[in-house]
Regions:
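Loop-to-helix element that buttresses phosphate recognition and phosphoryl-transfer chemistry
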Residues: 22-72, 140-152
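Extreme N-terminal starter segment of soluble prokaryotic enzymes
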Residues: 10-16
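Glycine-rich phosphate-binding loop signature in dinucleotide/nucleotide-binding domains
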Residues: 56-58, 159-167
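Residue-level preference for the first positions of well-ordered beta-strands
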Residues: 15, 165-171
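Phosphate-coordination/substrate-recognition cap region in phosphate-metabolizing enzymes
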Residues: 10, 49-126
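Domain-level recognition of soluble alpha/beta enzyme cores
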Residues: 187-214
Length: 222
């Protein structure tokens, strides 16, 4: 193995992967998917708290989806980062927006609340929440979960290929993150459970080394 290839295989990145803050539609239990909704005051407060936890992390790059709730979340994190505060405005990190980091496209469900979905699509709604192996996104003109996962993984691949080392902040969405968490545990896309999504404004840290994503031991801060 040549030296350059060996260095590339042994490189180590830290990925701080975060779900956006709570939005108005989160609070109303509406499917957002690839539509957007504004952050709530409670959502902003949580992001600021998370920003304080990460205030002494020197980020090399910041990636978000194309949706406003992730962009707004990332901007608040950077506003509370001590390294960014010291920089001249023009030298501060710029957000890199990737469509691959977008949320699952939920088709006809987007903008509808959970109760409405169960009334209009009782069988598919039941399958999505309680029997996802039988969920068929095509029936609601949406994106299949496995396709959304592959899209998200392609976005992560871009990120790790563009960054040799350092700390990277990635702000994305609940459903694609749940799919990713299952993926690194060697679970299938149809092991997805909407009820287990990471909380709004919360994050997990992954080390990327030798082509693998490894979640660091995570202790919940009280």
């Amino acid at each position: 193995m040549n030296i350059r290839k060996e260095i590339k295989l042994n490189r180590e990145l830290k990925l701080y992967i975060m779900r956006h803050g709570e939005t108005e539609w989160n609070m109303l239990e509406k499917f957002q998917g690839q539509l957007n909704s504004a952050l709530t005051e409670r959502g902003i407060e949580k992001i600021v708290k998370t920003g304080k936890e990460l205030e002494n992390v020197k980020f090399k790059a910041v990636y978000t989806s194309e949706l406003g709730r992730t962009i707004d979340t990332a901007e608040i994190i950077l506003e509370n980062n001590n390294f960014e505060k010291k920089k001249d405005v023009e030298k501060r990190l710029k957000l890199e927006k990737l469509s691959e980091l977008n949320e699952i496209y939920f088709g006809e469900w987007q903008g509808m609340d959970f109760k409405e979905i169960f009334l209009k699509y009782p069988e598919e709604a039941h399958n999505y929440f309680y029997d996802v192996k039988n969920y068929c996104a095509e029936n609601v003109k949406g994106e299949e979960l496995k396709d959304g996962l592959e899209r998200f993984l392609s976005g992560l691949k871009k990120i790790v290929n563009d960054n040799e080392e350092g700390n990277i902040l990635i702000v994305t969405h609940g459903a694609v993150l749940e799919l990713f968490f299952n993926y690194i545990e060697s679970k299938e896309a149809d092991d997805f459970d909407e009820r287990n999504l990471i909380g709004n404004g919360e994050y997990r840290i992954f080390t990327y080394k030798n082509g693998k994503y490894v979640m660091e031991t995570f202790e919940k801060k009280l």
